[in-house]
Each structure stands twice: as C-alpha cells, then as structure tokens.
C-alpha cells in the first residue's frame, strides 16, 4: 500500500519528515501505514539527519495566577511548559491523568527518544514522596503510566538519560530523610526497572549526567552531613556494570555550597555556579563565560550544538509567580540573547529532539 496515493514512497516519506511534531498524533490516526511510519525509530533518525527535527525545551513550571495578582502561592501548581526553539512558540502539555493538583513537586524530567519521562517528586497536598513514573509520547500526544520506582520511596535524587532507551537514577533520600547509596536503571521500552550496584557514598540532592557511556553522579551529601555538599563524584560504566573509583575533588574549584546544575554536549561537560559558566577541561574546571546578571538561581542548563541555554529565576526574593529568565549563548561569540519566557518558577527541565 502506498503511503500517499500516486506518489512514490520516498517522496511521501519526505512529506512526513517535514511535518511538525504537533501534527504527529493526527498523522498517526490517518491510517495504519502512516502510524507505522512515524512510530519507527528510523523515522526520528531520518528527521534528525535531514535537519527536519525540532528541539524542545521542556520545563516543570509553576502556574501563574491568571488574575495577575502577583501573590506568592504557598503550594504552587506545576505544569509542563514546552518551548519549540526554532519558532519561539510556547505551549503546555496536557495534564497527567489523575494528577488534579498538577505535577508532583520536585519531580525529575528526562527525555528518551520521543518520550518525556516524569519521575518521583512529592505529593502537592500531603508532601509524601511519589514512586510514580509517567511517560508522555510526542508521537501520540498521550500519557501512559510506567512501572513504579522499586525499593524505598526516594526524593531529591540524581537522574539522567542515555537519550536512547534508559533512565538512570541514584541517591536522594528516603521518607526518614536518610541519604541513599542505591541506584537503578529504567528501560523505557521494556517498562522495567533494574537495580545497579550501590554507590561508594550516600548522595542526597546530587546531580547526574550521562557522558561517554557512563552515568556520572556528582556532589550531594550524606545523612550526617545535612547540607554540607560533597565535592566528590563517581561514575557507573554501563558496559562493565561497575562503578569507577571515587573522584575526591571533582568540584574542588567551584567555591559553591551546592551541587551545581550540570550538562553534557559534544563530549564536553559544563556547569553553572557563582555567576559563571564552567567547562571541564584537562581534568579541571575552567571559566568559559559569565551568566547574565539578571539570572538568579540557575535551575536548568543545557548545551546544544553551538549554543548554551540557561534558565533561572529573576530575583533573589521572587515568588513562584515571578517571571522566569532565560538566555541562549552563542558559544562562538559568547553573545547572550534573552529568551521570551513564560512566567512561573521553574523546578526542572530537559531537552528533547523530535
């Protein structure tokens, strides 16, 4: 059966490749052949290779009072905002079914293929830890419930994705506020969790990135340290299924008291702290830029080809409804361009290319 009557399939496929991601659910509903075509992993690879893919900045963001009162909300309601970087268009994802009070507070967001994964967090009413996993498909524009996180209910854990198939989780604390050494991996396609060997030390409020085939867990603090963030890091090699040796002074040059927002791109590791953009070069951190002065408390940082994206909150005493501040930096010229942003405090974010 032809994809489009009276057109060669390669021409019809080119038409589908040029479609906006927002049209995918409609395309998939037209017929089985189109549904099958856009569901293939090769379809996404071809979109990227032909430069028809769209880059989406996805944020967990507090809903702003529509009346514009400017009041600080004691327990804000969070939703998922999406920026299509090519057009500058902001949209919102449909709410997660059954989550009438918005997203779990402090949940983690990661992307795997064309899916957005929402993990854990705290119940907005009871503040009890969630072990929930929700998966949003940008191909169908629908949510599904994933397998719950096994073991103790944890919050404030480090989380990263290999961008292809799996999500890795480490550290955080349990419901007794005890920091954890445990780690695990979620296979999105199989909807299955598997425990990893434990880390060398407890890591509450740690940061995590996936880089060069390794899951890196950075900073955090042990139960007895309570907020005294470690400068150490350790990495898990997914090919050998082993943790490497502890790196004692990985963050020794930061001068910061928390684990800084960190990201990876093109084999390079970046972090933001103290108003500076830092890059890990030759086994040490080096300053490569300065964050614009009106960005307070960086909540998310990402690097894309040739550019750095920084999202933060605007003022030191800002309420949850305060306008988010975002910038894109051209890495070749170090020039910052301000983003048009939604209002509302940002807790988490991720990038997805579809």
From Swiss-Prot:
A single GO cellular-component term on record: SCF ubiquitin ligase complex
Keyword Ribosomal protein: no
Ranges of residues in domain F-box: 2-49
Top-rank taxon: Eukaryota
One GO process term, biological-process aspect: regulation of phenylpropanoid metabolic process
Pfam families given in the database record: F-box, Kelch_1
Residues in Kelch repeats: 63-110, 115-163, 166-213, 215-263
Keyword terms: Kelch repeat, Repeat
InterPro entries: F-box-like_dom_sf, F-box_dom, Kelch-typ_b-propeller, Kelch_1, KMD1-4
SMART domains linked to this entry: Kelch
Entry keyword annotation includes Repeat: yes
Coiled coil: none
PANTHER family for the chain: OS02G0208700 PROTEIN (PTHR46407:SF3)
Protein name: F-box/kelch-repeat protein At1g80440
The organism of origin for this protein: Arabidopsis thaliana (Mouse-ear cress)
């Amino acid at each position: 059966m032809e994809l489009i009557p009276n057109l060669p399939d390669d021409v019809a496929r080119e038409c589908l490749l040029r479609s906006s991601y927002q049209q995918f659910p409609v395309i998939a509903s037209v017929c089985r052949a189109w549904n099958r075509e856009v569901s293939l992993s090769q379809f996404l690879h071809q979109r990227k290779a032909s430069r028809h893919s769209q880059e989406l900045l996805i944020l967990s963001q507090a809903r702003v009072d529509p009346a514009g009162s400017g009041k600080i909300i004691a327990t804000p309601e969070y939703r998922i905002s999406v920026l299509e970087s090519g057009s500058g268009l902001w949209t919102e994802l449909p709410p997660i079914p059954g989550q009438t009070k918005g997203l779990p507070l402090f949940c983690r967001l990661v992307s795997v293929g064309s899916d957005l994964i929402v993990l854990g967090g705290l119940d907005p009413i009871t503040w009890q830890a969630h072990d929930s996993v929700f998966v949003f498909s940008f191909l169908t524009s629908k949510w599904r419930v994933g397998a719950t996180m096994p073991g103790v209910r944890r919050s404030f854990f480090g989380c990263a994705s290999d961008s292809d198939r799996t999500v890795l989780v480490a550290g955080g604390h349990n419901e007794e506020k005890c920091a954890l050494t445990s780690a695990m991996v979620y296979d999105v396609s199989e909807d299955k969790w598997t425990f990893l060997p434990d880390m060398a030390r407890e890591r509450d409020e740690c940061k995590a990135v996936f880089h060069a085939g390794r899951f890196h867990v950075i900073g955090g603090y042990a139960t007895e340290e309570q907020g005294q963030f470690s400068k150490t890091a350790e990495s898990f090699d997914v090919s050998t299924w082993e943790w490497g040796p502890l790196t004692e002074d990985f963050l020794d040059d930061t001068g910061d008291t928390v684990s800084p927002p960190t990201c990876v791109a093109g084999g390079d590791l970046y972090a933001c702290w103290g108003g500076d953009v830092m890059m890990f070069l030759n086994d040490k951190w080096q300053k490569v830029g300065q964050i614009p002065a009106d960005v307070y408390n960086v909540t998310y940082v990402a690097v894309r080809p040739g550019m750095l994206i920084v999202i933060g909150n605007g003022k030191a005493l800002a309420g949850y409804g305060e306008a988010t501040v975002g910038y894109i930096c051209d890495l070749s010229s170090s020039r910052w361009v301000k983003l048009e942003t939604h209002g509302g405090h940002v807790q988490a974010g991720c990038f997805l290319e579809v």
